């Protein structure tokens, strides 16, 4: 188990959120970076059985309960319906279908929109209420409804439904030859069998006119419950009133040895308990009429787009209509449903017509509206809805065809093509067939049917269909006629044999290898020989699916508001396909649609080891067209080679998984009308033994996770009805199961000539072993491959238990369960200090760690950017193995920071103080701590400052030397130049002085005589004074010369 689960490891981004206010007891988180709750957020829609607060918020009375709910763009949409509702049908007048005001049954279903009005936790406030009205009925439609009858649905107590082999029960073959029906008593005694059907055997039977059928205005049939204390027999008739006994006797099948009707009531079909489990409404012990049941069942599933709300039915009772409500509608607006009869589903009508032709050997040769399927007044399709969802503002839906009614209304009886079909209802039902391990060669030979020898074991799987034919008013203009049963078989192929034998109930395949022999619900048999073309068996079901655009929804709304008979809605991107009704496959037998069985087509169908095999539940394996849990989502990865599957959807059907991959192109639907270019790819993966052991009727919830590409289907099978009609715990059965389906899987590609198989990785597995002792269970949340959360009610209090995987079986972890606490209405389990709870335990270091680790020289930014240092500030004690945690730091100042933990939860994801969902804080309550005393400046700031100063001085010195040395050289050159100049000046001065001296001397000679006369006067020395200035060079001429030289140097440089 553990190895298997590792192969399908789920990265489930889910967090358990218990105890929400306003009785939204459970909601769950997504990835921490998610800013929005969407329709695809895993478990964003709360799952709980107690919704009284939402009911009161919607201003509805206590009779209302929640049928479905979804979240669209953070708003919550809830579908409410009342168990007190009563609807009536009147064949005359204009208001044919209406709420019954005389019995205070005017309690229609509602869709209510809520919004969150707080930023702390969730507090829902009503935005708008939409009422779901009853449908308009045109005159043509009324002609159909007047004579339409509905057959009893299957329940866990339906006759012939419990076919699974039980431990300790002996199953035997009963041989009845031609004319030996009266030997039943001896056969019974020989094998020690009871006169009434017991869990290990089933009785075939023939219904007389009107048995188990009801018109819309009549009460739903109910039959005597089984009493296991009387060896499988029914309760004594004294426990019934005479009216109830008489009604039950008239509607019970004939099961006596000779095939005649019994004078006393001693047989059964269903119980009140079983009918209530599928949604049948009662007034005390009396079921309400059929039309009320159909309305109540039709308001079961909800999907929301940007502009529309769509409501459809369920998998138990047929839906004849669906609602499309405009979100802009006023609260008091009349929101009428659209008839499926007024909706064209592409590929569907041809498939349905072909199915009837194949079954009855009847082929229509004209296209006039007077023939069966071309006239709305003679057809009434109904669907068992497996689910609806919305993706990218488009609706995805799927379901099974519950049945239809049609007539060959040709007036000629002379034509060989019409004589055998005139006045015959061309219809089919949801019944399955006889099963045989060896085929029907020995069972059905020639035309003997069951009057011939029975040399092999076989069983009848089902005995009831849903919508069945009627006859009497079979012409286009006929208005009167008796109501009688018309069998869906040609007149000349009817069998008159009475089928009343006890038959071995070995669960086998649904097809014969020597031809197809089928018994219908009414005790008539026909067969196709092996030399004839392989035709779909009546065990095959018509599975309808598609994607609906906003424009098509608007058309459906317009049709609903119309009272005309010619308003048609075209849903273009829909398809139909035959699906087999697998029980146990036999080798060499062809599957539906020409597919080979898994054993012969190269597929590896593995039964996982370590899983406890559980005997298939009779109901789950007998209801032929049962399907649950359609869930769609954005699928970015293509599934089939060469195809881009933008949207993916998964639905579980009886026997396997259907994957639908929608290819709408560039976020818009394909506009092509070419049916060969299908916008939808289809794949069917058969269940293995492990999945087949899960009772699909116990389905609770489905989630899709886009990141992992996994769908998780949750089933609650802890309580099952026993064969004595009482709710008793099944002690040897697991409480919960989770079927996990991957985005990819076995992909079937079919053409006209061959059938090939592409095998992609598949993650189809059952997570079982989750068992709870609580009485009221609301769901299972797979958190990871190691942990699951079981949500239950214990003494009217919501309780969360955490289960841990222990070698494939999940066992409760008491410590973790106790630690999942609330946070005063917050969204997440709160953290508890000084205790190892689900978040583990965080212990912070003292502030002295800064000095001890020499961190006082580091700054806040350094610490924040160094996780190794940051994580040394705390010690983490995990709550479970491999749980991890880290610290998230916030800068408080230049010298301090605040830290808080970021912890891994059970879902594998990390959460911190800032985690939100839809923008709302989680308020987990993680602790925080401030560390102070870090360096205001980094340790490198002072050294760098000093170094910078020294560097600058050094640069200046270098620059100074670089400039000073050349200037010194220039100065020396200047000095040398000055010396030379001054030498030249001195030479010149000397020369001039010599000239002057010679002049003076000569002048003195001229004046010698007069000078001699005055020789006594010595103070006259003028020449000496004249020569003095040239000998002393002034400073100014020196400066002017330096400037010139420097300029010259600059010029040179």
From Swiss-Prot:
GO annotation, biological process: cell adhesion
Sorted UniProt keywords: Cell adhesion, Cell membrane, Membrane, Signal, Transmembrane, Transmembrane helix
Gene Ontology CC, one term: plasma membrane
Pfam families per the UniProt record, alphabetical: MGP3_C (PF19342), MgpC (PF05220)
Cystine bridges: none
Chain intervals for the UniProt region annotation (Disordered): 162-207, 224-261, 1024-1053
Membrane topology type: Single-pass membrane protein
Cleavable signal peptide: 1-25
Biased composition (Basic and acidic residues): 164-175, 1037-1053
Location of the protein in the cell: Cell membrane
UniProt note: phenotype after gene disruption: Probably essential, it was not disrupted in a global transposon mutagenesis study.
Keyword Signal: yes
Full protein name: Mgp-operon protein 3
InterPro entries: MGP3_C (IPR045839), MgpC (IPR007885)
């Amino acid at each position: 188990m553990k190895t298997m689960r590792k192969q399908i490891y789920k990265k489930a981004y889910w967090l358990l959120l218990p105890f929400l206010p306003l009785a939204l007891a459970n909601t769950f988180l997504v990835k921490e970076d998610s800013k929005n709750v969407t329709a695809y957020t895993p478990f964003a829609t709360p799952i709980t059985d107690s919704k009284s607060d939402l009911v009161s918020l919607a201003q509805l009375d206590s009779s209302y309960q929640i049928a479905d709910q979804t979240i669209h763009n953070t708003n919550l949409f809830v579908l409410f319906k009342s168990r007190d509702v009563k609807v009536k049908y009147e064949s005359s007048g204009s208001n044919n279908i209406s709420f019954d005001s005389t019995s205070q049954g005017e309690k229609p279903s509602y869709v209510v929109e809520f919004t969150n009005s707080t930023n702390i936790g969730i507090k829902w406030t009503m935005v708008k209420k939409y009422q779901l009205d009853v449908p308009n009925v045109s005159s043509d439609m009324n002609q159909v409804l007047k004579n339409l009858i509905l057959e009893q649905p299957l329940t866990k107590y339906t006759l012939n439904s419990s076919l699974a082999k039980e431990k300790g029960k002996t199953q035997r073959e009963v041989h009845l030859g031609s004319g030996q029906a009266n030997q039943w008593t001896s056969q019974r005694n020989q094998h020690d069998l009871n006169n009434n059907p017991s869990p290990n055997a089933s009785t075939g039977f023939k219904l007389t006119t009107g048995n188990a059928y009801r018109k819309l205005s009549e009460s739903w049939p109910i039959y005597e419950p089984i009493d296991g204390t009387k060896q499988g027999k029914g309760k004594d008739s004294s426990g019934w009133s005479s009216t109830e006994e008489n009604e039950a006797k008239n509607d019970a099948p004939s099961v006596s040895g000779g095939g005649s009707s019994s004078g006393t009531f001693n047989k059964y079909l269903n119980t009140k308990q079983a009918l209530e489990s599928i949604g049948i409404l009662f007034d005390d012990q009396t079921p309400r009429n059929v039309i009320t049941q159909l309305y109540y069942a039709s308001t079961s599933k909800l999907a929301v787009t940007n502009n529309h709300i769509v409501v459809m039915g369920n998998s138990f009772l047929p839906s004849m209509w669906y609602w499309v409500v405009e979100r802009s509608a006023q609260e008091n607006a009349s929101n009428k449903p659209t008839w499926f009869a007024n909706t064209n589903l592409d590929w569907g009508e041809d498939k349905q017509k072909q199915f009837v032709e194949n079954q009855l050997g009847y082929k229509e040769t004209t296209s006039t509206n007077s023939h069966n399927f071309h006239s709305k007044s003679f057809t009434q399709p109904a669907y068992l809805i497996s689910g609806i969802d919305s993706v990218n503002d488009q609706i995805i839906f799927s379901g099974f065809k519950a049945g239809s009614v049609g007539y060959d209304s040709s007036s000629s009886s002379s034509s060989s093509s019409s004589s055998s079909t005139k006045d015959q209802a061309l219809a089919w039902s949801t019944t399955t067939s006889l099963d045989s391990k060896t085929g029907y060669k020995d069972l059905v030979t020639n035309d003997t049917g069951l009057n011939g020898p029975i040399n092999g074991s076989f069983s009848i799987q089902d005995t009831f269909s849903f919508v069945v034919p009627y006859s009497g008013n079979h012409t286009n203009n006929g208005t009167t006629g008796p109501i009688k049963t018309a069998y869906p078989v040609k007149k000349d192929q009817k069998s008159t044999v009475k089928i009343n034998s006890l038959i071995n109930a070995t669960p086998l395949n649904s097809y014969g290898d020597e031809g197809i022999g089928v018994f219908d619900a009414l005790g008539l048999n026909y067969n196709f020989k092996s030399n004839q073309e392989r035709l779909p068996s009546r065990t095959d079901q018509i599975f309808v699916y598609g994607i609906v655009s906003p424009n098509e929804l608007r058309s459906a709304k317009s049709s609903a508001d119309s009272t005309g008979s010619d308003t048609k809605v075209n849903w273009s991107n829909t398809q139909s396909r035959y699906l087999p009704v697998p029980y146990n496959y036999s080798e060499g037998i062809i599957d539906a649609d020409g597919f080979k069985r898994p054993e012969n087509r190269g597929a590896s169908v593995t039964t996982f080891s370590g899983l406890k095999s559980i005997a298939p539940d009779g109901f789950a394996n007998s209801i032929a067209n049962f399907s649950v849990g359609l869930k769609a989502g954005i699928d970015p990865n293509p599934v089939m080679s060469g195809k881009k599957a933008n949207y993916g959807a998964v639905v579980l059907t009886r026997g396997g998984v259907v994957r639908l991959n929608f290819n709408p192109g560039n976020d818009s639907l394909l506009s092509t009308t070419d049916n060969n270019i299908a916008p939808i790819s289809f794949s069917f993966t058969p269940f293995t033994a492990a999945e087949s052991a899960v009772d699909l009727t116990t389905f609770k919830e489905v989630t899709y996770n886009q990141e992992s590409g996994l769908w998780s289907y949750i089933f609650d099978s802890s309580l099952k009805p026993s064969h004595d009609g009482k709710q008793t715990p099944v002690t040897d059965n697991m409480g919960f199961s989770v079927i996990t389906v991957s985005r990819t899987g076995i992909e079937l590609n079919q053409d006209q000539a061959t059938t090939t198989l592409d095998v992609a990785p598949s993650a189809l597995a059952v997570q079982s072993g989750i068992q709870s002792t609580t009485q009221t269970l609301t769901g299972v949340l797979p958190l990871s491959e190691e942990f699951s959360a079981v949500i239950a009610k214990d003494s009217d209090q919501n309780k969360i238990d955490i289960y841990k995987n222990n070698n494939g079986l999940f066992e409760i972890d008491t410590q973790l369960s106790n630690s999942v606490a609330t946070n005063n209405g917050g969204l997440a389990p709160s953290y508890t200090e000084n205790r190892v709870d689900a978040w583990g335990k965080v212990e912070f270091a003292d502030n002295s760690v800064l000095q001890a680790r020499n961190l006082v020289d580091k700054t806040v930014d350094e610490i924040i950017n160094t996780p190794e240092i940051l994580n040394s500030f705390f010690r983490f004690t995990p709550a479970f193995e491999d749980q991890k945690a880290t610290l998230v730091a916030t800068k408080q100042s230049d010298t301090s920071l605040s830290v808080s933990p970021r912890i891994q939860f059970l879902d594998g994801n990390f959460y911190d103080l800032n985690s939100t969902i839809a923008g709302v804080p989680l308020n987990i309550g993680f602790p925080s701590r401030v560390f102070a005393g870090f360096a205001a400046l980094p340790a490198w700031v002072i050294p760098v400052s000093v170094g910078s100063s020294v560097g600058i001085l050094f640069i200046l010195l270098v620059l100074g030397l670089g400039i000073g040395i050349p200037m010194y050289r220039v100065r020396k050159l200047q000095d040398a130049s000055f010396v030379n100049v001054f030498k030249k000046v001195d030479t010149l001065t000397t020369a001039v002085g010599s000239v002057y001296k010679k002049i003076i001397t000569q002048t003195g000679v001229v004046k010698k005589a007069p000078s001699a006369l005055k020789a006594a006067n010595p103070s006259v020395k003028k020449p000496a004074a004249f020569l003095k200035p040239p000998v002393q060079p002034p400073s100014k001429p020196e400066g002017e010369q330096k400037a010139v030289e420097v300029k010259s140097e600059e010029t040179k440089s």
